[in-house]
A protein has these predicted regions:
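Active-site-proximal alpha-helix that buttresses catalytic centers in soluble enzyme cores
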Residues: 1-159
């Protein structure tokens, strides 16, 4: 049995969890398998009534539940622009803890949304360009700023 998780950093804002769930549901339809939404941290503190009555979950307890229910493979899909410390530090530590308890469970972690060392994948740029075009007013020349959360890690900001 396999369990697939779309994972973000986590937030105390309900809208962030609802958005992650929306994307996971859409992804489930595209890949033909259930993709579960989970955050690395924080989201489990959001009151359930703010996220549709279904408590938000963090990845650690979610993967342990799946392993207890017989999962032998965990696939983690990072919903991150680049290799933040959450992906290079916390996530491997958390998955190592899982594998200490469930050594038969194989864990695979996909690349973040942008892999600066891989081929130039411009799908995200095309998606953003489509979003800009949707907001254009005829006859105007927009000025566009692309802003993210930011990071002190050069590998993350390089993307």
């Amino acid at each position: 049995m396999r369990a697939i998780f779309l994972v973000d950093n986590g937030s105390l804002r309900a809208q962030a969890t609802l958005n992650l769930r929306r994307v996971a549901t859409s992804l489930s339809g595209l890949v033909g398998e259930t993709v579960q939404a989970a955050s690395l941290l924080h989201s489990n503190k959001i009151p359930a009534d703010e996220v549709g009555g279904i408590p938000a979950t963090t990845l650690g307890p979610a993967v342990e539940r799946c392993a207890e229910q017989g999962a032998t493979e965990i696939i983690v899909l990072p919903f991150f622009f680049g290799p933040s410390k959450a992906l290079t530090g916390y996530l491997p530590e958390r998955m190592a803890t899982l594998q200490e308890r469930f050594p038969h469970v194989k864990v695979r972690v996909a690349q973040p949304l942008v892999d600066e060392f891989g081929d130039n994948d411009l799908r995200l740029a095309h998606l953003l360009a489509d979003n800009v075009r949707d907001k254009l007013r005829p006859g105007t020349k927009p000025h566009v700023a692309l802003v993210d959360h930011g990071s002190p890690i050069p590998e993350v900001t390089a993307v």
